Amino acid sequence: RGIFPQFKINELEIFPIKNIAQKNQIKFSIFSDFLMYLYQQNSNNILSHTDNTRIASHIEDILNMMVYELYFEEHMKEVDLDVLQFVTPVLESLQNLPIEQQIKELYEWYQKPENAVRQRLMLIDTRSPDILAVIHKSV
């Protein structure tokens, strides 16, 4: 008992949940599907050299950046940390593939040294030390 936090309705009313357009909701839903697949105990490893939980941690990093952009869009654009502009075309290019292939290709895309999302994630501490770096360190 007492494992899960309990909230009262009045506490949830002040919780800052963003209302986002349907087209953006789909992106978050896709990433959630990827994570649920990767964390299934009975799913095969997508890559022979990398455990699914390792892939999931990178997908969580991308998803975190997307969430930050929901709440700090202007700031992220000002300091060149916005990522949705890069994630959107990749997701669109993967949409007709099986989920395993989507995850594999997203991971391989993200692992490239020139990947803008990956580079921006690594720049959080220097470009946004007082906002995003503080949040990111607590995740």
Where are the language model's segments positioned?
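Non-catalytic DNA-recognition/assembly elements of restriction-modification systems
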Residues: 19-139
